[in-house]
Each structure stands twice: as structure tokens, then as C-alpha cells.
């Protein structure tokens, strides 16, 4: 029972990370940002447990590249006299994404006792299928639609103007891009990990059809 609850929480956290949204009560702070904040606590604890804690080399290199992108963005803004600051805080966005991912993967590892690419992919696939069902249910049930809109802000309302279905933090370009990525992930698993997922191929195919259709 405890493991089942842990898996359900893992699915919810995966959705919070992959399809972040804001609560109306906390404008400006989405679920991914909150998870990134939690990652600082986890990281501080883990570094404190090590006698010779060091910064990961790959993380350092990625941070330098992100800072360079932000610097180039600043230079182009000044040179071209524009106000497009889309990439000015790119390095912060990268840290938030990585921080949120760190919290999620540490929780999944805690629940399952291990961590693998396949396991993470399975959670992402499950979340996308879940979002499809939520979007469809909201489209045919005004009560559920109103309930969700009553406490979600930001991306929760994307899609209403176009009359399209939308999930929880999942709509328009956000949904299209990430659903496409997950469809490619399913194909990749079927082609390259057949021996390990042979028993579950029907489930992967059903997930593919649900995501493609809805």
C-alpha cells in the first residue's frame, strides 16, 4: 500500500514537473519552480553528508554555456536596441529545469530503490496518457472544467480561446511539443529496448494511440 501511494505521488510529481502550472493562490510560482526549490534542500543535505563534496563537472560546464547564451542575449539587446529578453535569464531557467528534475528523480529513486532511463520514460508516458484523459473529461464535464479552473492559474487557461481541449498545465504548444517528444520516446523504447519491455508492448501501443488521438 505504501509503495502504491509512492507511485501515485511519483506520477503527480512527474506531471508537476513536465506540465508545470500555477495555483491562483500563488501567482508567479509554478510547480516546477517549487520542485527546484526543494532540490536545494535535498542537495544541501546530500552535500553535507559527503566529506569532500564537489560540484559536478557536467553541471558546471552546462552552467557556463547557459551563462554565455544569456550574455550573448544581453549584447544583442543592447546592440540592436530591442526589448526581447527571452534568453536573458536562460541560465536561471536551466537551473530551474535541472533542479526540478533532480527532485523528481530522487523521489523516484526513493520509491523504487533504483533509477533508470526506462523508468523515467514510463512515468512520462503515464503522465501524458493521464493528461489526455483529464483533457477529454474536462471537455465533456463542465463541472470538472470549472473545478480545475477555480484553483489553477497561468497555463491552466491556455487553449480556452481557441476552443481546444487542455489538461492541467497542458495545452497548445506545451502539449504539442512534449507529447511529440513522448511519442518519439515510445518508438525508441520499442525499437531499442524490446527485450526488457516485451511483456508491456500492448500497453505502449495503447499509450501511443491515446496520445496521438486525443
Give residue ranges: language-model regions.
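N-terminal signal-anchor transmembrane segment
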Residues: 1-51, 71-79
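Membrane-interfacial loop-to-transmembrane alpha-helix junctions, especially the N-terminal start
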Residues: 1-10, 52-67, 116-123, 198-202
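Juxtamembrane membrane-water interface segments that cap and precede transmembrane helices
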Residues: 15-25, 154-170
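Membrane-interface micro-motifs in multi-pass membrane enzymes
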Residues: 25-35, 89-90, 163-183
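Hydrophobic cores of alpha-helical transmembrane segments in multi-pass inner/ER membrane proteins
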Residues: 35-43, 96-105, 177-189
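Aromatic-anchored transmembrane helix interface
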Residues: 64-68, 83-106, 119, 123, ...
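Alpha-helical transmembrane segments of multi-pass inner-membrane proteins
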Residues: 118-145, 170-214
Amino acid at each position: 500500500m505504501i509503495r502504491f501511494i509512492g507511485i501515485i505521488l511519483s506520477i503527480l510529481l512527474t506531471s508537476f514537473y513536465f506540465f508545470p502550472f500555477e495555483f491562483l493562490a500563488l501567482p508567479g510560482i509554478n510547480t516546477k519552480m517549487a520542485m527546484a526549490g526543494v532540490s536545494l534542500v535535498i542537495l544541501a543535505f546530500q552535500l553535507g553528508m559527503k566529506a569532500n563534496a564537489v560540484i559536478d563537472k557536467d553541471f558546471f560546464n552546462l552552467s557556463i554555456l547557459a551563462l554565455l547564451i544569456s550574455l550573448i542575449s544581453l549584447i544583442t539587446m543592447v546592440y540592436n536596441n530591442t526589448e526581447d529578453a527571452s534568453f536573458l535569464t536562460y541560465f536561471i531557467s536551466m537551473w530551474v529545469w535541472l533542479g526540478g528534475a533532480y527532485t523528481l528523480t530522487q523521489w523516484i529513486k526513493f520509491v523504487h530503490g533504483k533509477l533508470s532511463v526506462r523508468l523515467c520514460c514510463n512515468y512520462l508516458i503515464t503522465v501524458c496518457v493521464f493528461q489526455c484523459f483529464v483533457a477529454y473529461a474536462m471537455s465533456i464535464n463542465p463541472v470538472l472544467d470549472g473545478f480545475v479552473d477555480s484553483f489553477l492559474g497561468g497555463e491552466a487557461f491556455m487553449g480556452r480561446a481557441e476552443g481546444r481541449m487542455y489538461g492541467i498545465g497542458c495545452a497548445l504548444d506545451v502539449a504539442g511539443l512534449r507529447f511529440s517528444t513522448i511519442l518519439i520516446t515510445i518508438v525508441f523504447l520499442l525499437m531499442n529496448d524490446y527485450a526488457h519491455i516485451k511483456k508491456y508492448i500492448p500497453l505502449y501501443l495503447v499509450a501511443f494511440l491515446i496520445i496521438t488521438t486525443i
